[in-house]
Structures are given as C-alpha cells and as structure tokens.
Amino acid sequence: MNGDTRAAVVTSPPPTTAPHKERYFDRVDENNPEYLRERNMAPDLRQDFNMMEQKKRVSMILQSPAFCEELESMIQEQFKKGKNPTGLLALQQIADFMTASVPNVYPAAPQGGMAALNMSLGMVTPVNDLRGSDSIAYDKGEKLLRCKLAAFYRLADLFGWSQLIYNHITTRVNSEQEHFLIVPFGLLYSEVTASSLVKVNLQGDIVDRGSTNLGVNQAGFTLHSAVYAARPDAKCIVHIHTPAGAAVSAMKCGLLPISPEALSLGDVAYHDYHGILVDEEEKILIQKNLGPKSKVLILRNHGLVSVGESVEEAFYYIHNLVVACEIQVRTLASAGGPDNLVLLDPGKYKAKSRSPGTPAGEGSGSPPKWQIGEQEFEALMRMLDNLGYRTGYPYRYPALRERSKKYSDVEVPASVTGHSFASDGDSGTCSPLRHSFQKQQREKTRWLHSGRGDDASEEGQNGSSPKSKTKWTKEDGHRTSTSAVPNLFVPLNTNPKEVQEMRNKIREQNLQDIKTAGPQSQVLCGVMMDRSLVQGELVTASKAIIEKEYQPHVIVSTTGPNPFNTLTDRELEEYRREVERKQKGSEENLDETREQKEKSPPDQSAVPNTPPSTPVKLEEDLPQEPTSRDDSDATTFKPTPPDLSPDEPSEALAFPAVEEEAHASPDPTQPPAEADPEPASAPTPGAEEVASPATEEGSPMDPGSDGSPGKSPSKKKKKFRTPSFLKKSKKKSDS
C-alpha cells in the first residue's frame, strides 16, 4: 500500500443559485442608434408607426391566397343556405376583387379532365364574370345564356370532349335578330367565361367582341349557321371530336341500338363529310340529311353533332351520344363483330320518366316539370359551383332541403323591428306611467319576434316567370308536451269563421253602444225554479226583465198585501160577529147603536195598531158569510188615494166601514175592532158631500152594501164618517 494514500474526504457541491432571467434591457443594446432614435421619438409618432405596421400585416393577409379561399368558401356556404342578405353581396364583391387582384402564385391547374382538376392546387377562373359595367350592355336573358354556354364549355373540358382550341358550342340569342354566341377562336375551353363569348350574326360577322381581342373561326361556324338556317327550333348546337365518336362514325353499321343511351337518341342522321364546309352546296346537303326532327347528326369519319331546343337538351343528347359510342366501341372489341351482338327493339323501348314523384314526407306541392336534360344539367352546375366556378346558373329546384327546426318558438328571429322603446335623446330612465303606456307596444313587439308554425319552401320557376316564389306550408306533426300559452284569446281547434263572426258581432255592439250583462252562466243554464206564491207576498213584474227573458215565469199582482195581517184572532172574530150582526139587525137597531156610540166615548186602550197604508187583498181563510154573495166582493177592492199630509195616517180613509162598525157595537165592554185616534166630531153636510166619491169607491169593502136589500142609499151615506184629512183641511180653511 502506498504511503501517500490518505482517507477520502467527501465534500458537498456548492449551493446552486437561481438561474438568471433574461430581461428586456439584456436584449437591447443601449448604444444602438435605432434604439436611441425610437426612445427619443415622440409618443404620437411612435403610435403612428405602430399603426402602419399593423396595416402592413392586414394588407399581407388580404393579399394571401389562403385568405381568399377561406372567404370564398364562406360565401359559398351562405349561398347554399339561401336567403341572401345585403351583407353577403358585399362579401361577394370583396371576394371578386381579391380574386382579380391577387396574383396566382401557384402553378395553373392542368386541364383536360376531371381527375386532373381534382389534383390541381390552383384557383379556377369564375364563369360568371359579368360584374359592374360589363353587365350593363346585356339584358337578363343574354346574361343567363352567356353563363350557361360558358359553363357548358367548362363541362366539355372536364369530360374530355375538348380538342385544343377546336370544336365549337353555339347558342341562339334571339330569333328576331338572328344573333349567336360562340367561343373566340384561340381560347381554351378552360378559359371561357361569360364575358369572353363573341356575338355574331348568321353570316359570321362579329356583333359584340366580348372581353377579348380574338376573332371567330368562320369555317367552324359554317356548319352551325347551316343548321340554324334550316331548323328554327334549334337553340343550341354542339360539335365535338372524341375518339369513340370518330370510331363509330367510321363504321358502316353506324350507331347500333345496343344500349339505352343509343335508343334515347331517336332517329340518328348521317352525313358524308368531305372536309371543311366552304360552299353553299355542302350546307344544303347537311340540311337535307339532318331532316326536320333529328336531334343527332354523325359526320362520317369526323365527329358528332347534337341539336337541342335549349342548352340543357343539347347537352343531354351529346352526352348520351358519346356514352353510346364508347359502349359500342368496347362491345365490338370484345364481341368480335356486330353479328354477335344482341340488338334492342326501339318499338318496345320505354323512355325514362322526366317528371319524378314528390319526395316522401313532403307536403310542399308538386315538383317542377323538368324538360329534357334540365335535371342532369342542373346537377352538374351544382357540382361546378361547389368547386368554386361560380356559374351563375338559376336553379329551379334546390337539391338540399333546409331542415326546419321543429317545435321551436322562434324559427328566424326578427333582425329589424319597426318599434322602438327609447329615442336617442332619452336619458335611459323610464317613469312608471310611461312604462304602463308602453305595455301594448311591448306585447306587439314580442308577437312580431315570435315564430310561426309554418315552413317556408321555395317554389321553382314556371313558364311565366323565372323567379322562385316563397310558399308557406303548414308544419307537420304536433307538440307532445306544451306549456300554457299566455294571452290565448282564441282556443285551439276553433273554427276561424266562428271567431270572425263573434269578433264582428262584438265590434257592432261597441259601435252601437249596446251593453249587456254578459254571457249566460253555463252552470245554471236550463235550470227552472218554480216558486210558489205565498199569500201576501209582493211580486214585482218588471217589463225589462220580462222582455230580456231572464225571468220567464212572472206573476203580475194588481192588488196590495192583506190588511188583516196585523190583527189578532180575537179581533178578527169580533169583526166577523159584527158583520153578521149588521146583516141580521134592523134599521132601528142601527140607529140605537149609533146614538149609544155618540154618547159613550171609545176606549183608547183597545185601539190596535194602524193597518198598512197600501190597499191589500183580504185573506182567503176568513169565515164564509151566510149570505149568497160572492167572495170576490170582500177579497178585492180598488185602492183609495193615499193621504197627502205626512202627519196624519192614511189608514182612516182606507177602512171607514170598520170604524163605523166599531162605534155601532152594543156591548160597551167589548173593544171595537178599529177606532179613530182622534175624537169623533159631528159630520157636516158639506163634508159628507165631499167624501161621497171616496166612499163610493171603497163601497165594495162594506159588508152590507150588497147583502141587505132593506137599506136605502141615504142611510148608506150616513154610515160613513168624514175622512180625517178632509177635517183637517176644513179646520185650516176656517182659521
């Protein structure tokens, strides 16, 4: 072991310090002149420089192709949703401006087929480039034709029907002036736009050059002009050269009916092609071979031609012709000859229905009647629009239906309302009185913002107008769980006609100021109440109640209540005995009783309470009198005039016979039935004469007026005393 070896000493590492954080001044050189210039700059100037930097970044974003693509996709999504607002048109103009101003940094998209287009990274040129001042020179119909024809050229390029700058597709603008649209000679199909098309006449002279400086292929237009001159029904002509079409045109058998596409073409015409058409004899021969009804013409060893009454129909026939030629070429290559093929019978072939049925589950009415090729062409236009071509094609029937939000209170909330609660000059506070005044306005605003249970569907074009019309249809289905609807004045499942009639009736009542007690109670309707008339009850018979039929059973009472209700049984018995005594007694007895009555004062303690003031009907339970007179004499009588003085009671006049009988009572111990509260005084002849009419009216109340034949009229008059109110008036006159 070495002597230098020593014991190892374990030492701990020094404590680690916190890492140094980089600060702003560590990254800035204080001696840098740029830093010194920025530090010494005024704050306003420094802010202006910062704003310039921000604007520079915004300009870079606006000029970037990625931003343009994003903006274009957003606009396309808004177009699919429909209901284009005003702001969407502004976005479209911005997108068009950005598309035209931004340079195409990516390589151009390879043309010649749909697969090549899907692999491309470049931006396509829009078909509908008629913007601003370019669209003023054309009417609406020509704009649509230009967009359709330019989109047709793009479709021909995507399907591979183009042959460099050759082949032509033309359309007739109008029949009056015989103007036609054709592609400029030297322009590829992928470059054709609506504004670049050239307008020519029937001789091939240029009428409108469009947006290019290119001319027209006169030799190529000769074929089209010959067909247009011979067929006034032709609106569009397509002339293309495809390999399969050229192969079929070279076959002696021609186009064989071996596929449905071949049978859908109808009668196929053939023409022996001898080169470029330059003379008139060739035109006449083409017109003769085409005939008046053929839609398809095959040029021998050259190409294919289709004629249509519209752009869509011409596309339909040329597409089926190309497909039929490809099927025939491939079939003959595999079959070994036309003798080995099975041919279809054109007489048994049934054409496809052009009008599809109504989609299931929809109640929006019948779909538009499609013409030949319209449905297929519209589907392809939709494809081009989805790819960003912006064809400008007017769609007749939308493919995607907007799914309605079922059971939602607000489908599309109102963006603008015509009612405002506060003006610009208001302070923001609202008084309670003004708040109450605005209640009706708030209810109307809430109703305007509420949704409706209908769905809006777009109707397609019809023969009279190319515009689409909005049609409201009822929403299918019903809510399973609903809450109480506030202010529901019209109940559900109510006939609208009845509601309108009731509303008009209420308005008429308000105009005529007719106020009633309201509707009749449904609970007590039809319940009849039979009330038995109690004797002595006063029944009111109101004319208004009877006329309004609120009380059908009304008893009209012509007499008053019973005056004997206040008398006791003892008093009634005494009255009955006195009446019998009067009937049996003689005149002498009556005179004696009268004299005794005058001598002896009446007993004031036996005076009963005064009878009621109203003339009443006697009770039916009074004892029957032994005479043969009718009970109606004692039960009914006409009421006497009441006393006009408030101090004296009027009952004394109502019952004079009762008072007289009480004075004629022979028994002094027996209390009379009725007595006058004032002391009796001798009647005067004048008073008797004045009182005679009143007593004659009350004579039916006298029990002995009819029964005793021995009584003379003079003694009847002596029985009655002078009424109290006449005595009082006489005293006043004497004084």
From Swiss-Prot:
Xref: SMART domains: Aldolase_II
Biased composition annotated in UniProt, kind: Basic residues: 713-735
Membrane topology according to the record: Peripheral membrane protein
Biased composition (Basic and acidic residues): 440-455, 576-601
Interaction with calmodulin, as annotated region: 715-732
Protein's cellular compartments: Cytoplasm, Cytoskeleton; Cell membrane
Record-listed Phosphothreonine modification sites: T331, T358, T429, T445, T480, T610, T614
GO process annotations (BP): cell morphogenesis; cell volume homeostasis; cellular response to calcium ion; erythrocyte differentiation; hemoglobin metabolic process; homeostasis of number of cells within a tissue; in utero embryonic development; multicellular organism growth
Entries under InterPro entries matching the protein: Aldolase-II_Adducin_sf, Aldolase_II/adducin_N, Aldolase_II/adducin_N_sf
Domain of life, source organism: Eukaryota
Amino acid composition bias (Low complexity), ranges on this chain: 1-11, 698-712
UniProt modified residues of type N-acetylmethionine: M1
Gene Ontology, cellular component aspect: adherens junction; cytoplasm; cytoskeleton; membrane; nuclear body; plasma membrane; synapse
UniProt protein name: Alpha-adducin
Organism: Mus musculus (Mouse)
Gene: Add1
